[in-house]
Amino acid sequence: MFKAPPQASIEEVIRTALMFPCFVDEGGNIDLMKEVLEEELKEVLGSFQKDKIPGPDGWTIEFFLDLFEILGRDLLQVVEDSRSAGWIPASFNTTFIALIPNSNNATSLNDFRPISLCNCIYNIISKVIAQRLKAILSAQVSAEQFGFLEGRQIHEAIGVAQEGLHSLKTRSLKGAILKIDLSKAYDRVSWLYIRFLLTHLGFGISFIRWIMSCITTVSFSVLINGAASPFFHAERGLRQGCPLSPLLFLLVAEGLSRAIRVARDEGRFSGIKVAPNVSITHLLFVDDVLIFCSGDRGETRVLKEILELFSKLQVWK
């Protein structure tokens, strides 16, 4: 799961990245890499859920909140050093993996889901990055995505899906709804694809390096019956439990959304009409995907090509 599979060709990566417009300008990049001030740091500390299990460093958010008068200046300097360098030290980026059972009758590894317990300092730095990144993504992620962004609720996605199903049933339309559950979606994400996307979207070199260091310098240790295994490194994937992961996953999933929208705009994929000038093509909520298809053989072929391409790029199944 942690090893990188054979990568898609550079041409395939570039072809997919070109579906995105460049949406980060010079002013946006200045804001992304501006100095971290005490007020921003306090806001980040206050945004964390309390009583979380600590990572390998043993520190908790409550520790820094309670002792901010004493430690605040030093903590701010650590975050600022990371920002100015555009890098996070590997020593900050060690992570415990705890296996959480999906049911009371878990008997095999497939019955467990991994949760990452990151170092507290890492969580603080990555949350600073995530808050700044979210301000840009909120206005750019397509309306078909309903996860991780303020103002987008799952009940809205459910309502749209019901409308599509209702149209198929009551208007005697030919069509199909394809439900896709992305297997181990976070674990299979390609780092190469993330780097290409960030570059193409116009993010600055320093900000990209800052993000990629969060992803690529990580080392893992698995907790088994409370005992930690030796640390090892990964070559792909995003951590469930890292503040950055939901937003980076949004970007990865946005590639699939844009590919379907491009096919629609080019007249190669129509989806299902729910009104004279309104059609539904797809909905995404985290790792759950609904695709609405007319059932036409040509459209089915287009959809197959899109899914095969993204299977190569992110190694989704």
What label would you give each PLM region?
Residues 1-110, 120, 124:
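Surface-exposed loop/turn segments and immediately adjacent short secondary-structure elements
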Residues 110-141, 159, 235-266, 311:
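Conserved pre-motif C helix in the palm subdomain of viral-like polymerases
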Residues 182-286, 294-301:
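Conserved polymerase palm-domain catalytic core
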Residues 55, 94-97, 113, 145-147, ...:
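Catalytic palm active-site di-aspartate
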Residues 52-59, 108-117, 156-199:
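Conserved catalytic palm subdomain of right-hand nucleotidyl-transferase polymerases, strongest
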Residues 30-46, 72-83, 97, 128-133, ...:
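Inter-domain linker/hinge segments that demarcate the starts of reverse transcriptase
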Residues 2-12, 51-54, 73, 85-91, ...:
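Short helix-interrupting loop/turn segments at helix-coil junctions
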Residues 1-5, 45, 53, 68, ...:
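Residues that mediate protein self-association or partner binding, especially
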